[in-house]
Amino acid sequence: MKKRIPTLLATMIASALYSHQGLAADLASQCMLGVPSYDRPLVKGDTNDLPVTINADNAKGNYPDDAVFTGNVDIMQGNSRLQADEVQLHQKQAEGQPEPVRTVDALGNVHYDDNQVILKGPKGWANLNTKDTNVWEGDYQMVGRQGRGKADLMKQRGENRYTILENGSFTSCLPGSDTWSVVGSEVIHDREEQVAEIWNARFKVGPVPIFYSPYLQLPVGDKRRSGFLIPNAKYTTKNYFEFYLPYYWNIAPNMDATITPHYMHRRGNIMWENEFRYLTQAGAGLMELDYLPSDKVYEDEHPKEGDKHRWLFYWQHSGVMDQVWRFNVDYTKVSDSSYFNDFDSKYGSSTDGYATQKFSVGYAVQNFDATVSTKQFQVFNDQNTSSYSAEPQLDVNYYHNDLGPFDTRIYGQAVHFVNTKDNMPEATRVHLEPTISLPLSNRWGSLNTEAKLMATHYQQTNLDWYNANNSKKLEDSVNRVMPQFKVDGKLVFERDMAMLAPGYTQTLEPRVQYLYVPYRDQSGIYNYDSSLLQSDYNGLFRDRTYGGLDRIASANQVTTGVTTRIYDDAAVERFNVSVGQIYYFTESRTGDDNIKWENDDKTGSLVWAGDTYWRISERWGLRSGVQYDTRLDSVATSSSSLEYRRDQDRLVQLNYRYASPEYIQATLPSYYSTAEQYKNGINQVGAVASWPIADRWSIVGAYYFDTNSSKPADQMLGLQYNSCCYAIRVGYERKLNGWDNDKQHAIYDNAIGFNIELRGLSSNYGLGTQEMLRSNILPYQSSM
């Protein structure tokens, strides 16, 4: 008798809500201790044609209609095994059918197992022709994975495509623990579509039902399916109780959406958070529209505005079409300047000063590219501060390298600047910048000689109000032509450190750059897009002091620097330190009296910068950097970070960050640099830590203290319990959320979050500490 005993899979939930990916090794191995494994040789491929072996104490039959096997019945085919006290085999010839219908009844202590499931029950039935199967009052346990439960009746239909449960349950908790379970009056699992439908779904904690839904459709397996995701809740001082219930919508293979009703008790309404993702021939993108119909807190604080709708729109797109066209969108806009102070969003924060709305279309072929873009800014400032937008901007590059020993490039730009205020200057700027360079290099050094010409034309309009209120007058039409000459040389010396550390290698890399740019008075040009560039060691060797084109500082300077690196015997960099300085032969000027240090007439060694990295061991790392600017009469910026990392869940990091008030005034827009909260600069010390404190318990925390204000700048503490069938996470965060100009003090928001994660519904067994650290307002960054 060669017939296949069909595979009996226990339940849709157990087979579908488990994944092998992303398991944390320690906990995963512990959780497998209570899970049975398949210990027979695994048979691969189609087992339909394999023989069926039946062993029993007794057998009798009425050939060809039926046969009865009793006493320790053991039936095997391929990976499947069926054991019972009694098995009845029936065969009946149906009218008009070439093959007889063969069915099996199993009675008493029914035990079925294969490489996927173990099932036990008092009674079972199977149709050997159609593979339809029924099992009554069965207990099931998944093999090699978490998942078990019960069902009054389990049915398999459609060549094992569908598993149907009547009064079925599922839990991923190990045997002996029923901390949580999901129960449904009927459950249909479609393996081909990887979707589960549950009627009268009840979620239980222990024996107590705490959630009910008349119908649920859950995505299962790796195939994207529509359905509800795990809800989340937290409590904050700005919104009180908050609850999230995300729903995932699989619209098409190339697009999907997540719709999240977000209830905020203090706001008295539900914010609808709608995320849409897509993939087209023109690229991939993401759109987010968050909408709050009304906000009673905002209405109380801004009574003149009435019932205000609050919203956020975000659009990010990046794509290439036909290998030559580039499309990019980076667009963020909100209903009001207080939006990110009142609502948490991954598309902005309370520390952001503005939102950007940028669109660009580019065309690129060999040696040539062109981009047309528009850029606008939404400034989050209640002082009605103006801002400039580029509407539109054209950037063109043409390269012709290996022209003999030379490389050449021509860069061109045309842009029209528009201000948000009617009385501010506006301009059209056209810039042309041809460059020729002579690059020379070998394995121990390089020398690059470069010359360029920077020609810029400004046509400025709407100057009446500005010229009437300022001593320096702007000009309607300005032409500025500035040549630039640069020589940049670098050497690399290498030595074996066999005497000190066998197998280690040290390099010494001196670098010298001379830069010359003649002075041109730019006081007749308004500053539309230039700001002081932040400098580290590599920044010392930049051509420009300012970003943008409105301020190009004169230069007659030599930049010198040296870097040393140490590599171990595996060519891993263990240590480096870089120190450099800029020596000015003449004062660097633009003619703009608004730039403070241009009135100091300083020359000599003015700017110093240093960076260092030390990988002390496999677990210890140190990074540090400092910039000193004599034009600011102070250390401009500095930062240090010392980290001990045992693994991704065990780390301690100490941090220090400093920015002088003079540096802030020089780099930030005036409406921020002059604000009260920045008058003393930034001087903060802090620490972040993550560590398991007991079996399955872990803690994560961050604390930053501002020594200028003698107040905490940011605090975060999280505690998590992790087990085989659930995880509980509780978090507290106190973060800076704005500035009260009337009372002249910082505004803080306190948040308490609570999250439960059901194991078996997620493939992640990790402690979640990295996510908690990186979600902080001062996010963790590794020093290793």
From Swiss-Prot:
Keywords, alphabetical: Cell outer membrane, Disulfide bond, Membrane, Signal
GO cellular component term of the entry, any: transporter complex
Protein's GO biological process: Gram-negative-bacterium-type cell outer membrane assembly; lipopolysaccharide transport
Subcellular location: Cell outer membrane
Residues of the signal peptide: 1-24
Main location: membrane
Disulfide bonds: C31-C724, C173-C725
Post-translational modification remark: Contains two intramolecular disulfide bonds.
Superkingdom: Bacteria
Family assignment from sequence similarity: Belongs to the LptD family.
Assembly and binders: Component of the lipopolysaccharide transport and assembly complex. Interacts with LptE and LptA.
Name of this chain's protein: LPS-assembly protein LptD
Species whose genome carries this gene: Salmonella typhi
The encoding gene: lptD
